[in-house]
Amino acid sequence: SVLHVFNWVSTLFMKPIPDSARRAIPFKFMIFSIAFIIYGGATAFLNAQIAPDSDFIHNTYWIPAHFHAMFFGFSGQMAIAGFYFLYPYFTGRMYNQTLGNWHFWLWQIGLFIKITGMGVAGYLYFPRWVYDYLQMPGWAESQLFITIGGYMVGLGFLIFVFNVAWSARYGKPAADDPWPVEGGEAETAAPAAPAE
């Protein structure tokens, strides 16, 4: 994973990235997915050690925090970035940039709050796989942060679904090359917008 991160980051510095690409939703999701793989990778060090794993974090919320950072923070965001990138090619229309930004920021902030709350809960020995538990100091607050973060991520995802559906019908028609970058790899023209 560390080699992948160095590869991705060094690739970003090979050529200057145009401002239009930096403002694009797929680029933002891709950059933050790299940040989340670093975050998730940092939690993996404790998972890989025998003593902390068996005495400290085994069957606590530390494990779901690591999973959410890697699965939703990295893999999920890369999939979303790919979807936003390919959306004009699939539909012939561009997605709504404002709704995309709302989705992006709600997802990032909510996911960070949720994962950090899970990590803190795991650090405080909050057990997983139980439906009822004692009220220990810090557990209720951690659960509150996890819940708030979860609602933010859920709201962001609902905005994403609405954006996909709305933009397929009412979005601006996409250009032949929706992502014009000098030396870009996109060699396929986007399909024409469906007739109304």
Where are these regions (language model features)?
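Active-site-adjacent structural elements in folded domains
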Residues: P16-I17, D55-I57, I146-T147
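Hydrophobic cores of alpha-helical transmembrane segments in multi-pass integral membrane proteins
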Residues: S1-L12, F27-A51, Y61-G92, N96-A192, ...
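Membrane-interfacial, low-structure loops and terminal tails that flank and connect transmembrane helices
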Residues: M14-R22, E182-G183
